[in-house]
Amino acid sequence: MTEIQRLLTETIESLNTREKRDNKPRFSISFIRKHPGLFIGMYVAFFATLAVMLQSETLSGSVWLLVVLFILLNGFFFFDVYPRYRYEDIDVLDFRVCYNGEWYNTRFVPAALVEAILNSPRVADVHKEQLQKMIVRKGELSFYDIFTLARAESTS
């Protein structure tokens, strides 16, 4: 493992710890806070469907199924899962991208990581210069930018 890769992996792990990214479902009412109209609309639609089913002779026997399904499916809105970021997921296009998104392109690295790379005696001057050029050109760097630098370091 190269020095840049090690520093990037440490940063990703500290980010996972700080943001409680552990792939575990946690009870949360963030859905209600973010989408109160949708949440109320769900209940209005549920009660409207329930009223129609109770009025119908053919559907009134399966009302219990509607109630059970609604409760089960509604339960999913009360759980958030914060997926764990991993170094191995960077620049990989597979199912995890659908789950995590391309976080490595949309999140910027902390300034502490850039400073650690620039101050590390184990990183070659060529890579430090390349990093400084990237900073001048782009301003803020994404995790993917540092990943490409780590890849360049491993090939040299």
Swiss-Prot record:
Keywords: Cell inner membrane, Cell membrane, Membrane, Transmembrane, Transmembrane helix. Residues 57-58 are periplasmic. One of its GO terms (cellular component) is plasma membrane. Residues 1-35, 80-156 are cytoplasmic. Its main location: membrane. The chain crosses the membrane at residues 36-56, 59-79. It is a multi-pass membrane protein. The keyword Cell membrane applies. InterPro entries: Memb_YlaC. It is found in: Cell inner membrane. It comes from the Bacteria. This is Inner membrane protein YlaC. It comes from Escherichia coli (strain K12).
